[in-house]
C-alpha cells in the first residue's frame, strides 16, 4: 500500500496506540449513540452525566499525554502541568461567562454575577475581548504557552534541573492557585466561574451539545497523540 494516510503511517509500528485509539473511538461512538438515539427508559440508554464524565476523562488524558511528553521523552518531571491546564480552562470559562449576558441572576449584561456581587462597577481590563470566540480560543492556547516559555527560559537558563525543577513547578502551581482563589483577582475566587449557558450558540444543557463536546475532545486527544508520536 503506497498511498497510506498520514495517520496510518504514524501508527504503523504503534500497535498499542492503534488499540487504544480504536477502543476509545468505539466507546465514544457507542456512548454517543446510546445517549442520543436510545430511549431514556431503555436499559441501554446512557445518561448525559456519563457522557460528561467521559468527556472530562478524555480531557484529563490530554493533560496526561502532555506530561508524558515532557517527562517520558524529555526527562523533565513537571509537577506544575495543572497550572497551564487551568489557565486554558479559565480562558474558556471567561468566554463562556461573557456569553451569559443579561441571563445571569442579577441581569447585568456587562458583568458576570460574581462581579456584581463583589460590587465591581466595570469589567476588569483582562476580561476584554473574551466575548469574541476567535480571540478567546487564541488566548486559551497563547497564555499557557507564553507562561511556559517564560518559566522554562529562566529555569533552564539558570540550569535548574532534577528534583529542584520539579519543586519549582509545584510552587508555581500553588502560587497560581492562591492567586486565583482571591476574590479580588477577578476570577470568581474559590467558587470559580460557573452557571455557563451556551458555547458558540449551542445550549450547554442539551444532550447534542454534550455529545458534540465529547467527540471534539476525543478528536483533540487523537490529534495530540499523533503529534506526540
PLM regions: where:
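Transmembrane alpha-helices and adjacent helix-loop boundaries
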Residues: 1-229
Amino acid at each position: 500500500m503506497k498511498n497510506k494516510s498520514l495517520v496510518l503511517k504514524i501508527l504503523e509500528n504503534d500497535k498499542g496506540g492503534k488499540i487504544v485509539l480504536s477502543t476509545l473511538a468505539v466507546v465514544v461512538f457507542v456512548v454517543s449513540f446510546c445517549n442520543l438515539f436510545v430511549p431514556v427508559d431503555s436499559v441501554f440508554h446512557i445518561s448525559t452525566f456519563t457522557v460528561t464524565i467521559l468527556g472530562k476523562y478524555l480531557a484529563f488524558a490530554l493533560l496526561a499525554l502532555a506530561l508524558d511528553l515532557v517527562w517520558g521523552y524529555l526527562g523533565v518531571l513537571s509537577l506544575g502541568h495543572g497550572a497551564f491546564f487551568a489557565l486554558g480552562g479559565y480562558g474558556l470559562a471567561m468566554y463562556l461567562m461573557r456569553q451569559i449576558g443579561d441571563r445571569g441572576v442579577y441581569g447585568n449584561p456587562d458583568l458576570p454575577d460574581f462581579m456584581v456581587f463583589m460590587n465591581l462597577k466595570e469589567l476588569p481590563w483582562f476580561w476584554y475581548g473574551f466575548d469574541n470566540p476567535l480571540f478567546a480560543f487564541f488566548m486559551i492556547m497563547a497564555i499557557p504557552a507564553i507562561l511556559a516559555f517564560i518559566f522554562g527560559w529562566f529555569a533552564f537558563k539558570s540550569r535548574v534541573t532534577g528534583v529542584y525543577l520539579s519543586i519549582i513547578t509545584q510552587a508555581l502551581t500553588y502560587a497560581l492557585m492562591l492567586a486565583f482563589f482571591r476574590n479580588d483577582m477577578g476570577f470568581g475566587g474559590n467558587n470559580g466561574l460557573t452557571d455557563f449557558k451556551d458555547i458558540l450558540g449551542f445550549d450547554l444543557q442539551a444532550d447534542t451539545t454534550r455529545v458534540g463536546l465529547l467527540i471534539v475532545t476525543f478528536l483533540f486527544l487523537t490529534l495530540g497523540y499523533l503529534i506526540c508520536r
